[in-house]
Amino acid sequence: MAGASVKVAVRVRPFNSREMSRDSKCIIQMSGSTTTIVNPKQPKETPKSFSFDYSYWSHTSPEDINYASQKQVYRDIGEEMLQHAFEGYNVCIFAYGQTGAGKSYTMMGKQEKDQQGIIPQLCEDLFSRINDTTNDNMSYSVEVSYMEIYCERVRDLLNPKNKGNLRVREHPLLGPYVEDLSKLAVTSYNDIQDLMDSGNKPRTVAATNMNETSSRSHAVFNIIFTQKRHDAETNITTEKVSKISLVDLAGSERADSTGAKGTRLKEGANINKSLTTLGKVISALAEMDSGPNKNKKKKKTDFIPYRDSVLTWLLRENLGGNSRTAMVAALSPADINYDETLSTLRYADRAKQIRCNAIINEDPNNKLIRELKDEVTRLRDLLYAQGLGDITDMTNALVGMSPSSSLSALSSRAASVSSLHERILFAPGSEEAIERLKETEKIIAELNETWEEKLRRTEAIRMEREALLAEMGVAMREDGGTLGVFSPKKTPHLVNLNEDPLMSECLLYYIKDGVTRVGREDAERRQDIVLSGHFIKEEHCIFRSDSRGGGEAVVTLEPCEGADTYVNGKKVTEPSILRSGNRIIMGKSHVFRFNHPEQARQERERTPCAETPAEPVDWAFAQRELLEKQGIDMKQEMEQRLQELEDQYRREREEATYLLEQQRLDYESKLEALQKQMDSRYYPEVNEEEEEPEDEVQWTERECELALWAFRKWKWYQFTSLRDLLWGNAIFLKEANAISVELKKKVQFQFVLLTDTLYSPLPPDLLPPEAAKDRETRPFPRTIVAVEVQDQKNGATHYWTLEKLRQRLDLMREMYDRAAEVPSSVVEDCDNVVTGGDPFYDRFPWFRLVGRAFVYLSNLLYPVPLVHRVAIVSEKGEVKGFLRVAVQAISADEEAPDYGSGVRQSGTAKISFDDQHFEKFQSESCPVVGMSRSGTSQEELRIVEGQGQGADAGPSADEVNNNTCSAVPPEGLMDSPEKAALDGPLDTALDHLRLGSTFTFRVTVLQASSISAEYADIFCQFNFIHRHDEAFSTEPLKNTGRGPPLGFYHVQNIAVEVTKSFIEYIKSQPIVFEVFGHYQQHPFPPLCKDVLSPLRPSRRHFPRVMPLSKPVPATKLSTMTRPSPGPCHCKYDLLVYFEICELEANGDYIPAVVDHRGACMGTFLLHQGIQRRITVTLLHETGSHIRWKEVRELVVGRIRNTPETDEALIDPNILSLNILSSGYVHPAQDDRVFFGNDTRTFYQFEAAWDSSMHNSLLLNRVTPYREKIYMTLSAYIEMENCTQPAVITKDFCMVFYSRDAKLPASRSIRNLFGSGSLRATEGNRVTGVYELSLCHVADAGSPGMQRRRRRVLDTSVAYVRGEENLAGWRPRSDSLILDHQWELEKLSLLQEVEKTRHYLLLREKLETTQRPGPEVLSPASSEDSESRSSSGASSPLSAEGQPSPLEAPNERQRELAVKCLRLLMHTFNREYTHSHVCISASESKLSEMSVTLMRDPSMSPLGAATLTPSSTCPSLIEGRYGATDVRTPQPCSRPASPEPELLPELDSKKTPSPVRATETEKEPQRLLVPDIQEIRVSPIVSKKGYLHFLEPHTAGWAKRFVVVRRPYAYMYNSDKDTVERFVLNLSTAQVEYSEDQQAMLKTPNTFAVCTEHRGILLQANSDKDMHDWLYAFNPLLAGTIRSKLSRRRSAQMRV
């Protein structure tokens, strides 16, 4: 085994965070034991290969089959070396490599079981093999030592007493060793593990740019492993001693890479020095052991520099000496570390050539002791020869003592013999001889020490370590873990009493023996206690601790000159002795309590009944004590101040009351004067024009009823409003369908009309907000326009409101834009998954409503049992099946019949009807039942609620059943048959319905039949018409569609306390039955499996965007009605900068740091409790129509910790800010885009923001980790020539840190500021892009004119991208209204049929039972009822309903009808047509004809369905759909030179007539309505890079960084710039490309971009780059250019 080479292994680690952030590439490849490295700077260079004993590939994850784990590394290296140790050899394993390469991880690892390194695994395996030994003649002992080499100094990591640096000495026999290094005996692996943890804690580590926990020292873990074998035959014990050295080296580093400065730089220099020496030693040993040099003579250069470094000196035996050595070279795989990695490989390759001459260390102690004794004899003879023989006796006395005992004895003897020192000093060589003698005696004593003595010494050191920690106030558990911290038991100390302990840096300070200095960190002399603050001097005071008689320590406080120091509230100027419990104040804010444990203990012994203070001694106590000593009475001062404030408040309140009263009187006088002036101006004119009043016409009762009926009908007429909604929203519906087809969502959208009827009640989410307000006053049910969403993939149908469609459409557009950049495979996978985040899909329930049925309860009045067979009607009026229900009155204890499989309910449901609103409902003829709880059991009580429309509120051709209207047309409406029969005095109710008694009846759900097989799992639930709590439900039944009917046989007993409202309810109101089933007939069955398939992870993830909030309501501005905007006059793109400035120490307001990462596009990093200002800067192109006048108000509110906000809630935290300044400013240097003068307009305003005024905890506290605070800001800015202020709204994202926190700049910010091209403050802003639209004010006119001017143009004719894929699909229009009328008629007839069937069934039952019934149930009454019910009026939506036949109209009535007809057939007036809509005469006739067809009830539905307005009118959709999106042959927006005769109105406004000149001068007319909308920045980047810009009349080209996010191009100063400096709207700009122009200007690769305000010439780096930019700016133009180039090349090739 002797002469073996060093085992060398290399191991490559994964990328760290630093390398991943720089997108590093792997340059290391491993194949077997061969390692190859590639030069990233010269890829064509041949890779360098190295061969080692082991090559470990740990770059990938553990799932990789080639991954080398910690276990594998130990199995290959550690187990072999441990085996050598058991054989008796010295063993060494050390790790080598650059910093952060993974050396410590390989050697020491982590705490996890599978992450442990070589050292823990080797120790565990060592004791495992020891414990597995069964030979009784073998005994083992293990000693460990742990040291670190820091800055060429050795420190003991196991003994806390060895705080100083240890000396490295060299013995002729032992070689280099560390003097006084602790060697602790261990008996188990747990002991070693505890020692390793204790040694790793004080080890020196620090953070660098390369590694967050960089080892700043070399660590050497030594194990002395002794094996004793007792030979029973010879009675001889032999020993084998092995030394196991496990070395964790610090990594080599470069100062520029690690960013080392100061102490880190000094540490790195020492690390590099020792590693350089190690490299020299390895190289020298490799050269000595190499073949060619063996036969040569030893040269001077063969000297091996072991002594140049402490590391190599201690490892001398392990490098080419008596040791079995293994080296692990740790490698970094990143290309940025190529040089360091190549150097490591070369050193490892040289280390392979080193050969070590290892020998078995057998019986070393006997030989060593003999040689040491000979050396002692020789040294003693040397002393005798020099005349120092009397020292021999002293030395003999020390033999056999422990090293510590011998040293103490020698010291005491030397102190007593003064002449001995003189003799030693003057004797030549005597001092060296004595030193060597001491050294030898220490070694002999250590060798003679028994194993038990070593264990006792180890335990004593452990006790000393725990005692030292206990004295410092650290409590330890028995297993060595930390238990807690307590006050020291002996040492005097200072306890911090500050409210904020961070102000005084530490909670507790120790006062050491001697002098303890207190001062600032920048003092010339080093201070023991360092404090900071304005009133702390460089050397503030001194604590002097002296020991007096009896061992008592006395602490004296000595203040320095000019330092403010107080003890118990008194200022100290001379040295003062401190007593335990004294309060010490240094400066103004540092408050401490002095504690002296020994002194306090003695005082308690002297006075055992010492009084405790009445209040705790804390910071407040010390401050009050200081004020009292200074003669300041805070209580009296506060009372005086409070009295002054009260007096001031009283005076100001009286003054304000007086001023308010005076102002009120002034306003009243002014109003009276104005009123008199108006009366005098108008009354004479009115009197002159006044005609003689006509006699009041007396209407008959029939005429009043007719007028009331007509008024009510036309008030709730909905035809025109429904048509407007259908026409105005058609373009949204078309776009949604087009996107659905292109994204293959299999979802279709179509308009649908929904009416709130009994058979189709509207869910709350479809009702508009004002529905709840007018529900009580509305006589007809509400009809709304909704969107029917047919999810063909999942077989589901949903209904959306129009507002929800618009919201979802925004998300669809984003998904469509993203899909253009995502691979098609990913898009298809996205289609197969239904998630909550997909805007096309909604969650759908398992059960679907089949239909509803109604059962009336009037048979309970007689009472007779009835079995009803009622139709199950769907919301569309289709009969889906039939339901058999039995209703009968029963006694309270009657049992339910046995139906076999029927279900018997466990108890009787108790219902309570309240009469408190009965008189009100009786007067209104509305059978609405009010409910309240009675005294019955709350567990079984069910409440019927009385809110909502009447039970028969569905639309009907016959208003007989509405029961909600007090005004009816004569002979047109009548009460229902049942109600007519049963109306009468309630006092005459039958005996079974006595008021106050309990009435019990039974409802039995028998069977359901004729339900289609497409519905499975049928169940039924029923409830009272107005109840909204839990319904009565049956169990689900399987439905096959064949065989006998479904038998529910569900019995429910209901007990009611008879009240007037209950009797009124059973007279006219039904019970509603709802039948549900699982719809199992899927439209596309093969797609079901795709829906459940998991989505593969997308290769691209787009950032989450913040929602756009609505403006925060203004607090100071009066509520103004927004005027109706007319045609758009002009549009501007606004670039807005938002800054939050914080007050700095120098008094300036500096913009707060902004982190531009994340979905918020900018997060403000703010400090807690600092004054702030908000600065807003507006940038836009200079134009004549946009002039900012002043900022009316700036409001902030909606404080929240989520991006979303509930805008419906009233925010109490809205705050109006104080505007400090506003006006036009000059652009900053960094905001300029071009070299010339920036012609853009910069308008800036600033406001003070006190976040504490919001009274919000989110703004007052420090933001928790991973949380962000959101706030909405709205600025109301007044503009010239505008009717109202423009509103700019922005959502802020903020994070609050503590006041003194140092904000770490993000990586992007560091890159930005480190480049030196931009100032730090210029990047600390958040940008927003807005679109300003200035529209003309639409003239109000008369109500009739307003109706004719309503924007009812059909938007379905506007072109939408992708509508070619709709295959002729068109949104429903006017025909939908007529079809919905037929559905309502059908529902009304079905309802009448059910009522009549119930009436006939009840009458037949009464006749068969011979019960006397009311007269009205006779056949004559029935016929009369039927005749009267057949003459009802139509529903409020019907245009065909007419009152009953009347007498012939007179002349006045005919004139009124003709006038109404003219108004209905009137077209747009000439003014509106000329000013806003370019429409021809023929088109006007077409529109007139269409309106006529729509209003003519004689036309067929097919004719009415062809309603379409002119397709040449401009689109009414603003924002996303401009004028170019609609097919307009002659767009008339913004003509170049308008003709006076075509625009008379406009000319009159521009040049007012002389008659109205005075009025114009008095009050200028404002014509425009501003509208500012924030533009959501697209996450899709079409292209980004540098472009050169050239503007006319500028100095030269400007290089700018451009990012294209359609439809905008954003320009930055550089790629490190985070703030947009210029925005170019590509949708309105014109891109021009000309090869002739390039040749003429001699500027290749250029193209021009022209806007309304400027023209820019852009130059790309290459021809290909230019075409890429053209494609990003204008894809159609780029395609045209490429097509021309292709044709040109083809022609050239043919030639």
Swiss-Prot record:
Residues reported in the UniProt entry to bind ATP: 102-105, 215
One GO cellular component term: neuron projection
Subcellular location: Cytoplasm, Cytoskeleton; Cell projection, Axon; Cytoplasm, Perinuclear region; Synapse
Keyword Magnesium: yes
Signal sequence region: none
Residues that bear Phosphothreonine: 607, 612, 1524, 1528
UniProt modified residues of type Phosphoserine: 416, 418-419, 932, 937, 1315, 1342, 1533, 1537, 1553
Bias (Low complexity): 1417-1441
Catalyzed reactions: ATP + H2O + a kinesin associated with a microtubule at position (n) = ADP + phosphate a kinesin associated with a microtubule at position (n+1, toward the plus end)
Pfam families registered for this protein in UniProt: DUF3694 (PF12473), FHA (PF00498), KIF1B (PF12423), Kinesin (PF00225), Kinesin_assoc (PF16183), PH (PF00169)
GO molecular function: ATP binding; microtubule binding; plus-end-directed microtubule motor activity
Classification via InterPro entries: FHA_dom, FHA_KIF1A, Kinesin-like, Kinesin-like_KIF1-typ, Kinesin_assoc, Kinesin_motor_CS, Kinesin_motor_dom, Kinesin_motor_dom_sf
Residue numbers spanned by region Disordered: 1410-1451, 1524-1564
CDD domains noted in UniProt: FHA_KIF1A, KISc_KIF1A_KIF1B, PH_KIFIA_KIFIB
Ranges where the Kinesin motor domain occurs: 5-354
Record keywords, A-Z: ATP-binding, Cell projection, Coiled coil, Cytoplasm, Cytoplasmic vesicle, Cytoskeleton, Hydrolase, Isomerase, Magnesium, Membrane, Metal-binding, Microtubule, Motor protein, Nucleotide-binding, Phosphoprotein, Synapse
Chain segments annotated as coiled-coil in the UniProt record: 366-383, 429-462, 622-681, 801-822
Binding-site residues, ADP: 67, 100-105
Enzyme Commission number(s) of this protein: 5.6.1.3
Top EC group: isomerase
Expression by tissue: Expressed almost exclusively in neuronal tissues such as brain and spinal cord (at protein level). Expressed at lower levels in the adrenal gland (at protein level).
Any single biological process term in GO: dense core granule cytoskeletal transport
Record-given protein name: Kinesin-like protein KIF1A
Organism: Mus musculus (Mouse)
